[in-house]
């Protein structure tokens, strides 16, 4: 079947398939990376005129309603119509009779044989047009492409350069501050639209000479340029993890580091995963089942800003397209919601912060320990409370872009593990946890205060066993212990799950890129030259060589063999993790497992533990973000070769910018990274990484997880994770239509992975929003859901992102604040003060007598 571009299709088309994959019935792509082709469609044809009347056509493939202009002559009971006079939108099918019958219209100047031929030609046109079998993708992505839209323009490169430098610099600057500010790439996506349109006013002058010349305004700013620049900014707007390690090394380990080391460690850790992402495209980017749900929000925002795409979703009523009674355009809907989101966020974000931490029961009983531990937000489990802060709702992911079955698995796991099991173990005093806060990501000593790792180290940061015995073992809060256990289970579960559910397709795609079936969006991308595999292989080899040079030439305590172990961690996890995230929006963090392995293979070497964590975790995380953007580029039909160079350029430029900004701050901000820094530049991320490196690298996991040690039982969760997918797979085979058949082991284990520091309040609000929109509305008002759901997600994110930046830069950072009950009530509770269930008296300790 031939893929078609928009120039050859005078209509916009939506199809509803009888055997499409539905998010309410089957977890998208859980069993197969391939897709199935829709067999029957239901269509409506309408003319753009405001004065129209209706006719209908039904047949074994299509049910078609025809709107025609009243000023055109026609005869009823004819056999066909002229397809060039009409555009297409969706309508529910009302007839499935065999054969073809048209109950309306023939133009007076056509013969029966001519219109008969036109019907056959139109049917061939319709059969040639495909769309995704996934309703989420159909609602967000056009199944067409305009190959004539330019991407490799001066606007793309100049705006990419400016936005990458600005976003990388600003986010790096404020990342060293507490509270921090992070400007999301969605802000760039919004600013780029009016700025690009403004550039359309430039004269079309010729700049340069010969082959090095270009025209200043040869074509209007288009959606593909917009998408390419946004993708570049998204890769670099968040702070590189390696810069936090640099903070730990310079400010806490007191190392003098060269510019060369700083640039190399940032770029190698950021780019090592890019090459592997390119080499694995056939598994985690190309398949239709790899939806990458979060990209759909960006896709809809692009479509909404650049035209009226999607406004034809619905049914024709009173000469207007109605989506379950709503006729407002996507653009106006986006504008209204974004403005409302911007205005409302000022309340939970500044005026009445209690709306963000809406733990009313804790406000009523501020000194009741049990109430605060069960229903609190800061150190409690967050049972029942709601939040009116959209940032809290989307803390885990955007619920409007998360499949309902994923939300069910995740929230069910939170309820079972953190709302039932954790309180039982906590109040029984397992591991003396009731002397610690119910929820915290910190480690503690036997007096209930944060563990002071410097008390068990020598001056060279090596472990001193005598000091350790005279001080205290490490104790983890119960929530932290269970989060660690779930992480262990998730790491092994994804391998078993991937083998059972996707193993056959992964093996087939090893030999044939396209697999059993191919998505229409992948087919349309064949209009462009692909970035070849050897480009990505070369990139991986070059960066791998630079990584070896970095750990060998500089003092990192990390031998090459240990580096290779770290790289193997990310390599073997990449495809299973990519499949999981591409389908579910969830991923398994490898930070704990890399620290665990690093602590066992290189005990007593905290700097080496940093390197193992950096190169075992970050290349996979960055590589999967690269893969996500490759999928977004596929949806937006951006030429792969141009995108390849744009992404590399942006990453290198952003990395150097972040290093330069951090270096400037080290020399120009007095007292940086100290707790007494007057402007809050205390380097909280660097301090956290430093403490983690001492705990996992210097003290080591052997003191916690080896046989005979307190947390040894958690190791068995590796086995539990490996076995659990067999159970869920068996249930799916036995009960394919029941909810029990939709249980997904990796999601059950990794879904609650943000606890701590997230709490139940983040998950309960997330689940409620997901239930309303991705279950109730999707089931009862499918046209509304398809037309507005992802627009709503983009508008809410956009309004909050812009409001957050304005509040921080214009009000909070200069020192503005409002002191009243609504901004202080939540801070006067035991929850906010992290009070444990059991308290110690002066000079009292708890815990084991021998460790």
Swiss-Prot record:
Induction: Expression is increased by cadmium ans repressed by cysteine. Residues 33-68 have a biased composition (Low complexity). Residues 1-14, 74-92 have a biased composition (Polar residues). Residues 105-134 form a coiled coil. Glycans are attached at residues 32, 77, 109, 256, 452, 464, 691, 843. Keywords: Cell membrane, Coiled coil, Endoplasmic reticulum, Glycoprotein, Membrane, Peptide transport, Phosphoprotein, Protein transport, Transmembrane, Transmembrane helix, Transport. The keyword Endoplasmic reticulum applies. The chain crosses the membrane at residues 156-176, 179-199, 259-279, 282-302, 333-353, 405-425, 480-500, 531-551, 560-580, 592-612, 642-662, 711-731, 757-777, 791-811. High-affinity glutathione transporter which plays a role in scavenging glutathione from the extracellular environment for the maintenance of sulfur homeostasis. This is Glutathione transporter 1. It comes from Schizosaccharomyces pombe (strain 972 / ATCC 24843).
């Amino acid at each position: 079947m031939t893929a078609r571009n928009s120039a050859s299709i005078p209509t916009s088309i939506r199809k509803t398939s009888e055997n499409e994959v539905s998010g309410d019935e089957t977890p998208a792509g859980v069993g197969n990376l391939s897709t199935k082709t829709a067999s029957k469609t239901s269509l409506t044809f309408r003319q753009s005129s405001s004065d129209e009347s209706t006719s209908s056509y039904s047949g074994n493939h299509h049910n078609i309603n025809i709107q025609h202009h009243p000023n055109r002559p026609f005869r009823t009971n004819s056999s066909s119509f002229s397809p060039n006079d009409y555009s297409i939108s969706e309508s529910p099918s009302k007839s499935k009779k065999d054969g073809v019958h048209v109950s309306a219209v023939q133009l007076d100047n056509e013969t029966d044989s001519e219109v008969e031929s036109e019907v056959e030609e139109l049917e061939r046109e319709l059969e040639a047009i495909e769309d995704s079998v996934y309703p989420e993708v159909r609602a967000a992505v056009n199944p067409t492409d305009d190959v004539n839209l330019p991407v490799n323009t001066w606007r793309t490169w100049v705006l990419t350069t400016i936005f990458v430098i600005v976003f990388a610099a600003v986010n790096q600057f404020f990342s060293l501050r507490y509270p921090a500010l992070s400007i999301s790439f969605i802000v760039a996506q919004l600013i780029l639209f009016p700025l690009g349109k403004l550039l359309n006013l430039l004269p079309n002058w010729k700049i340069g000479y010969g082959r090095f010349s270009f025209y200043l305004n040869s074509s209007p700013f288009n959606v593909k340029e917009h998408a390419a620049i946004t993708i570049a900014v998204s890769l670099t707007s968040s702070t590189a993890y390696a810069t936090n390690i640099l903070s730990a090394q310079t400010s806490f380990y007191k190392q003098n580091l060269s510019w060369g080391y700083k640039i190399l460690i940032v770029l190698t850790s950021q780019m090592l995963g890019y090459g592997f992402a390119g080499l694995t495209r056939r598994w985690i980017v190309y398949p239709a089942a790899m939806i990458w749900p979060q990209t759909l929000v960006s896709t809809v925002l692009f479509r909404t800003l650049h035209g009226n795409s999607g406004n034809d979703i619905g049914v024709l009523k009173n000469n207007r397209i109605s989506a379950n009674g709503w006729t407002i355009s996507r653009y106006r809907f986006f504008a209204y919601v974004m403005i409302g989101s911007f205005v409302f966020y000022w309340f939970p974000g500044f005026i009445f912060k209690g709306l963000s931490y809406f733990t009313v029961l804790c406000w009523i009983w501020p000194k009741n320990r049990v109430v605060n531990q069960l229903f609190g937000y800061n150190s409690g489990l967050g049972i029942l409370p709601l939040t009116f802060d959209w940032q809290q709702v989307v803390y885990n992911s955007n619920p409007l872009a998360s499949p309902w079955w994923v939300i069910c698995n995740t929230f069910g796991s939170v309820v079972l593990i953190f709302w039932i099991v954790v309180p039982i173990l906590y109040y029984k005093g397992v591991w003396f946890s009731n002397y610690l806060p119910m929820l915290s990501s910190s480690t503690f000593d036997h007096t209930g205060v944060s563990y002071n790792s410097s008390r068990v180290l020598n001056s060279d940061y090596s472990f001193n066993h005598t000091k350790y015995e005279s001080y205290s073992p490490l104790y983890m809060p119960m929530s932290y212990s269970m989060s660690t256990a779930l992480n262990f289970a998730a790491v092994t579960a994804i391998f078993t799950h991937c083998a059972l559910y996707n193993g056959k397709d992964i093996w087939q795609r090893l030999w044939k890129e396209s697999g059993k079936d191919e998505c229409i969006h992948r087919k349309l991308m064949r209009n462009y030259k692909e970035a070849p595999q050897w480009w990505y292989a070369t990139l991986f080899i070059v960066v791998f060589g630079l990584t070896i040079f970095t750990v060998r030439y500089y003092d990192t305590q990390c031998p090459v063999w240990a580096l290779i172990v770290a790289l193997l961690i990310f390599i073997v996890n990449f495809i299973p993790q990519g499949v999981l995230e591409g389908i579910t929006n969830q991923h398994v963090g490898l930070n704990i497992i890399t620290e665990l392995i690093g602590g066992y293979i290189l005990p007593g070497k905290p700097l080496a533990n940093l390197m193992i964590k950096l190169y075992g975790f970050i290349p996979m995380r960055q590589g999967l973000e690269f893969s996500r953007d490759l999928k977004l580029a596929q949806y937006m039909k951006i030429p792969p070769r141009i995108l390849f160079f744009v992404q590399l350029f942006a990453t290198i430029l952003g990395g150097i910018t972040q290093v330069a900004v951090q270096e400037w701050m080290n020399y120009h901000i007095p007292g940086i990274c100290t707790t007494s820094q007057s402007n809050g530049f205390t380097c909280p991320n660097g301090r956290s990484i430093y403490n983690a490196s001492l705990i996992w690298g210097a003290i080591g996991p052997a003191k916690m997880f080896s046989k005979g040690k307190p947390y040894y039982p958690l190791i068995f969760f590796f086995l539990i994770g490996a076995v659990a997918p067999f159970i869920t797979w068996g249930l799916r085979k036995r009960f394919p239509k029941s909810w029990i058949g939709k249980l997904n082991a990796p999601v059950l284990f990794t879904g609650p992975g943000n606890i701590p520091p997230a709490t139940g309040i983040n998950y309960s609000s997330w689940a409620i929003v997901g239930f309303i929109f991705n279950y109730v509305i999707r089931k009862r008002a499918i046209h509304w859901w398809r037309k507005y759901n992802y627009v709503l997600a983009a508008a809410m994110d956009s309004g909050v992102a812009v409001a957050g930046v304005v509040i921080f830069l214009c009000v909070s950072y200069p020192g503005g604040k409002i002191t009243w009950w609504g901004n202080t009530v939540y801070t006067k509770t035991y929850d906010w003060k992290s009070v444990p269930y059991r308290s110690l008296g002066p000079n009292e300790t708890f815990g084991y007598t021998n460790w």
